[in-house]
Amino acid sequence: MNDLMKILGQTGQAATFDQIRIQIASPEQIRSWSYGEIKKPETINYRTFKPERDGLFCARIFGPIKDYECLCGKYKRMKFRGIICEKCGVEVTLAKVRRERMGHIELASPVAHIWFLKSLPSRIATMVEMTLKDLEKVLYFENYIVLDPYTTDLKRYQLLSEDDLYAKQDEFGEDGFKAGIGAEAVKSILAGIDLEAERAIMRADLKEATSEAKRKKLVKRLKLVEAFIESGTRPEWMIMDVVPVIPPELRPLVPLDGGRFATSDLNDLYRRVINRNNRLKRLIELRAPDIIVRNEKRMLQESVDALFDNGRRGRAITGTNKRPLKSLSDMLKGKQGRFRQNLLGKRVDYSGRSVIVVGPELKLHQCGLPKKMALELFKPFIYAKLEKYGLATTIKAAKRMVEKERPEVWDILEEVIREHPVLLNRAPTLHRLGIQAFEPILIEGKAIQLHPLVCTAFNADFDGDQMAVHVPLSIEAQLEARVLMMSTNNILNPANGKPIIVPSQDIVLGLYYLSLETPAFTGVEDKEAPLFGTMGEIEHALDSGYLKLHDKIRARVVRTHPDGSRTTEVVPTTPGRMMIGQLLPKHHDVPFALVNQLLTKKKVSDVIDAVYRHCGQKESVIFCDRLMGLGFRQAAKAGISFGKDDMVIPAEKYGLLEKTQAEVKEYEAQYHDGLITAGERYNKVIDAWSRCNDEVAAAMMREISRQDPGKPTNSVWMMSHSGARGSPTQMRQLAGMRGLMAKPSGEIIEQPILSNFKEGLTVAEYFNSTHGARKGLADTALKTANSGYLTRRLVDVAQDCIIVTADCGTERGLTMRAVMDGGEVVSSLSERILGRTAAEDVLDPADGSVIVKANELIGEIDSMHIEKLGVESVKIRSVLTCEAKVGVCAKCYGRDLARGTPVNIGEAVGVIAAQSIGEPGTQLTMRTFHIGGAAQRGAEQSSVEASHDGTVTIRNRNVVSNSAGAPIVMSRNCEIALNDASGRERARFRVPYGARLLVDEDQTVTRGQKLAEWDPYTLPIITERAGLVEYADLLEGVTLVERVDEVTGLTSKVVVDYKQSAKGADLRPRLILKDERGEVLRLANGAEARYFLSPDSILSVENGASVHAGDVLARIPREGSKTRDITGGLPRVAELFEARRPKDHAIIAETDGRVEFGKDYKAKRRIIVKNDETGEETEYLVPKGKHVSVQEGDYVHRGDPLVDGPRVPHDILRVLGVEALSEYLINEIQDVYRLQGVKINDKHIEVVVRQMLQKIEITEPGDTTYLVGELVDRIEFDEENERRLRAGERPAGGLPVLQGITKASLQTLSFISAASFQETTRVLTEAATAGKTDQLLGLKENVIVGRLIPAGTGSVMSRLRSIAAGRDRSTLAATRPALPARDEVSAD
């Protein structure tokens, strides 16, 4: 068997392996890999072009240049295989051994490996307990180090300069102490370390360590020492005596024409090392002066550094053309490195690419393939068939036939192509629907024909897009292409489970036109409309001109019942709708009523969804194809077009403009009178124009959508309303007003563009609008890259999340509620629980009966039923609470959104989640400029209106009446809830502090009625009691300044952040309320009436003034608003996934309790939250400039903000736990996407958040070997604790930690995956010192080592393999029990 292997040139290594380990190589290991030492820097002889002996390409070491031929030509042919030529010393074998044989260089002096020296934290420095700076001084021959002081007063490892050394030697004598320099000295220190003893000493020290810094230092070194012990490596191996040389074929030297050579940079770097090494050997032999030898050693160290990682230390070594040479590290690093360029991104053979054109006559599963392309792609198949049928005798003959394009070739091509799917791909492939399989149809011409309905999935249009065609060769590949990738099997979008095979543009317009109803007949009673019995009659009437498509008629429609019986009924409809109704499959859940309405794009999507859910895939594919045909035909017949007059400018536009201009003037006047500040005026002006713009737009929409009898429907309105093309915002700019524009800085220019494109812009307006337009284009270019990078990070963090088991058996879950925003339901309960598994029985609130049992999947019918019954919240299983060891279980994941069925085991849900989140990011960023940078900013919310009719309940009510008698909200968490007649809560609104309440408890309100209003631009400070104001610590010119407004000449008193004086007089600006007797008033909660003022507060009362309860004492202005578009959105999503701390973040209370203000620090205020029951105090330090949103004496609950601002996810996790964190992250991320109208299912975000919560921080080590503060993987943590409990020891305690996606990717268990992501050198250095083992569980590491991925069909293969291996083992054990255990393993 071995001989056969030799002939085939295969090595005898194991073909299968289950894990890969990385370690630091010992010098012995490096020598054992090597086939000989390289002694000379020569490469090849310039005359003979043969490799030089003992040089970098030596054939004696690395193997022959030609197969089975030695260098001197004495032995040729296969029969001399394995002989070593006695003349030239070359083994006669395959030339490809030059790709796998290594050599080595014996160094004259040891050198440090730069990765272990410079990759932070420096491993060598940690081991020898020196700073990196000092260590470098020793290694690069600047300072000596005392290795053993003997009896002198020198310290061990003390650094000495050359002069110091001579002085000390004079003092203590030459042999009075031992000093060294360079890598030799460091190596002797490392060799002298007894790892086991060190560990014991450090563990003892750690128990006694008090200071945090000392602990950290000890822990760092202890971990490193333990890593060395566990991996069985020695620290001195980080210093090298031998340098390995990689095989010559991996650093080739290729002759160019003209007698020059192109070479890999590595050869230069190796040459440099060899030259310096040989020179050093010679100098040592010659007994050269110490200083020369030292210099040569330093140069050797630098050349080895450059070989391993050029540019890591000092200046990079450059080649002839001033460009830095590519070292071994650079070969691995970055986009062009080995990992990303060759292992993860391989190129494909058997592919072609061409421009795409539309193919409306294709079926959904077909694509048109140009004959020329097909001939080229299917060549091998054609050759085989030609030979098989005896049409060609040899492959050569077949080749000639194909080249001549003989007629029989085309017949054979037809036969080969039949039912052989091809893959079509459009770059950029943002999600898995960017590659789909189709059956090719041969066409003339040179362009690929694409089915119009799949354009959405590919994000393709026909303005010159190109697509690539790939041919799956093996029968397995064809099978997978057909079953998994066929376009007919990908009807639903994996991101949200909605159909993605939806009509767009002309098809939508055609169907919309077809389902219109003529306004003339709207008034006609249904009974009077003509009655038709069959479709034939209707068609006859249409052809004869008796009926128009849009006339109202009554028609007989067949209705199918659940038991299969059919009845007919008469329904009012139009001939057009009847035509669409004819296409519907016959099913009781797909009634004619679905299409008996005006069909917009969304409605058409709903129809397709219903057909898919109830009638299955085949029916829906046929339905979609027929619908497309009908849509195209009708759109062509209708001949819809629009002219200038279709853009109607509303008559009331000019009135609205005048009214707003008057408002703006009024604000100017108020500002000049000093009633409002400049910032408030700006905000109010912007608001007024925003409102005006909306009103003009509404007027224009009313005008355009008016349907006058006898007049055709406005075409622009039809296009926009149907969803075919154009949005209301675009129409607003054409016929309303362009509105507000943003400056390049992001602020809004307060003079809006009053004209629209139909009227034309003035020069000034045109100039103002150029900012926005240009910003849009610049954004697009930048954001595409950002979005791609976000997707890459998401894929990397989630790639090893795979469905591994059917059920993990957990009882835990998340509680789902409808998401409300300003009283509107933005995401209903039924949407959120659809396709999830119930964690506990869902009960009917009326009678307590079970609607859905625990661990059952909630389907469409169930979810609608639950919502109708008014269930508040449902507890569902979630991947966040799944207890599967690796990956997640099918029950916790729920429904596979792309199939509408429970998810299969082996589905790569992590990658799907990453693609679903990343794909819209790219699309959205490309979409910003369509609105031309018009500032889209709604008016700031300044009131709440009832969204339903109902009765009012006010929660946390704390109200005072102000001097005008209006009730003012004094509570910081007041909410107004609306209940319907049955007492169920329909909406809930948050009312801010200082708002005016316009309704009272139990009052009945109607929809649209205002409930409360407030000033959105300032935060007021309001008094609860009447009394006299007294200023405290408000000193003119110190904490209080009078600001004079340049424009109005009015002054206002503003509190400023004062610089602390040296005397340290602690000033805390505040207002105190006193009664007539001068006593300080008490508030309702018993605290004294003191109001602390933060900087920038504007005082509204004078010192000594008398105030009424509910009056405003001071206002804090909020900053002006910036434009909101996804540009703010994409970085926001990245910020959330990276778990960054937002700037000016909120500070939240970690316990319940009362607020007190402690003594201030220099630049911080101290807030103390004191719990009344336990008496424990928690202290928070807040920068002075921040506005504290609580007053002294307020009672706060755990999680309430003490300082306003965006919340920090880490705080939420620490204070409120995993469920609150997941809810926060999901809602925040969904908000960004919702703003753009993108639907993503929650479970995708949950999958990524699960990956971010993989690590646990140890708080209590118990009897484990863990250290406090160490980050441990959740799985390892649980396993270790189980082991400890079984042994009867104390388990470790820990808290979950939230990591950003980049950090989580780099901390993953697989070092191969982490290295291919980012910071390759750091990851590999860390893995090598720890001797890490990669279990090859994720997708990425398996792709890199070239195996099938353990997901999908690959997961089945790996399962079968492990079962078979186990069976083999047990069989072997049974048959040959006497054999030693070693053979059992090799039986694998």
Swiss-Prot record:
Q: Which SMART domains match?
A: RPOLA_N
Binding-site residues, Zn(2+) 2: C808, C882, C889, C892
**Reaction(s) catalysed by this chain's protein:** RNA(n) + a ribonucleoside 5'-triphosphate = RNA(n+1) + diphosphate
* GO BP terms: DNA-templated transcription
Instruction: Output the Gene Ontology terms for molecular function.
Output: DNA binding; DNA-directed RNA polymerase activity; magnesium ion binding; zinc ion binding
Describe its partners and assembly state: The RNAP catalytic core consists of 2 alpha, 1 beta, 1 beta' and 1 omega subunit. When a sigma factor is associated with the core the holoenzyme is formed, which can initiate transcription.
The protein's Enzyme Commission number = 2.7.7.6
Q: Where is Mg(2+) annotated to bind?
A: D461, D463, D465
Family, per entry: Belongs to the RNA polymerase beta' chain family.
Gene3D superfamilies from the UniProt entry: 1.10.132.30, 1.10.150.390, 1.10.1790.20, 1.10.40.90, 2.40.40.20, 2.40.50.100, RNA polymerase II, clamp domain (4.10.860.120), RNA polymerase Rpb1, domain 3 (1.10.274.100)
Question: For binding Zn(2+) 1, which residues are annotated in this chain's numbering?
Answer: C70, C72, C85, C88
Give the encoding gene's name.
rpoC
Organism, as annotated:
Acidiphilium cryptum (strain JF-5)
Q: Which cofactor does it need?
A: Mg(2+); Zn(2+)
Family annotation (HAMAP family): RNApol_bact_RpoC
Q: Which domain of life is it from?
A: Bacteria
Keywords annotated in UniProt:
DNA-directed RNA polymerase, Magnesium, Metal-binding, Nucleotidyltransferase, Transcription, Transferase, Zinc
Q: Which InterPro entries match?
A: DNA-dir_RpoC_beta_prime (IPR045867), DNA-dir_RpoC_beta_prime_bact (IPR012754), RNA_pol_asu (IPR000722), RNA_pol_N (IPR006592), RNA_pol_Rpb1_1 (IPR007080), RNA_pol_Rpb1_3 (IPR007066), RNA_pol_Rpb1_3_sf (IPR042102), RNA_pol_Rpb1_4 (IPR007083)
Cellular-component GO terms for this entry = DNA-directed RNA polymerase complex
How does the cofactor bind to this protein, according to its record? Binds 1 Mg(2+) ion per subunit. Binds 2 Zn(2+) ions per subunit.
Q: What does this protein do?
A: DNA-dependent RNA polymerase catalyzes the transcription of DNA into RNA using the four ribonucleoside triphosphates as substrates.
Give the enzyme class.
Answer: transferase
Q: What is this protein called?
A: DNA-directed RNA polymerase subunit beta'
